[in-house]
Amino acid sequence: IAIKYQKLNQSVNEIVKGQREAVSQVIKSLFTVELEQNKGKHKGPKASFLLIGPPGVGKTLLAETISNELKVPYIILNMSDYATENSYIDLVGSSRRFRGGSEGKLVEFVRKNAKSVIVFDEIEKAELKVIHLLLQILDMGILLDAYTEQYVKFGETIIFFTSNVGKSLYNDERNKVLSHIPKPIIIDAVETEKNPRTHEPFFPQAICSRLASGNICMVDRMETDILLEIIQDNMRKTISCLNKIYGFTIQIDPDVYKLFMYQ
């Protein structure tokens, strides 16, 4: 098992650039879960993670890469699509007793893919009813499929929540390495940050308490050298693709890569 997770750590870091500490925290937690999975029954998902940090630093990519490397199906649910009062129906479905009843996107996916990764992207944008559904998954590991009227089990799922909450931490230049910020400080920032539109906290206290008992990872800012490396890798892939399709041979002056960083 140890060798498996060492290889997983290496392969994920090759794809998710500049986030070694966050990757390490996630891998260690998954390793611990696998070691302890035979010690008794547990409620809730197999593992859950809250990834916090600035936009565009690889939070969603980290979750996606974990699923690809573990070779399990995954689904990414953008919570901005679940910001209205009745949007939760898209997740759990509507009763087939009514005309137009249909199965929910989330429960259908988990019913068909018991071992899977679920990414709730930008969780702070979710409507309150959606948050309550997520609480039920975290606490009980089940969700009622409104269409089939049967419970769907989430016990073998790995759940990632991503969030851009925590601006007081990642906008503070004194915090050089975000991934080293102690968990209690991160939790306090999550609990106290308010939605500028409603002037209410982004997260209800109930979900904060539940997330605090799980795995919380602060994801680091993207350093200039890492950004440059990502740009170079993407350009190499693009050039290779053009060469295979059209036979083009392209050479780029190294200084040109730096220009892309400011576009």
Task: List where the protein language model places each region.
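AAA+ P-loop NTPase nucleotide-binding core of proteostasis motors
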Residues: I1-Q263
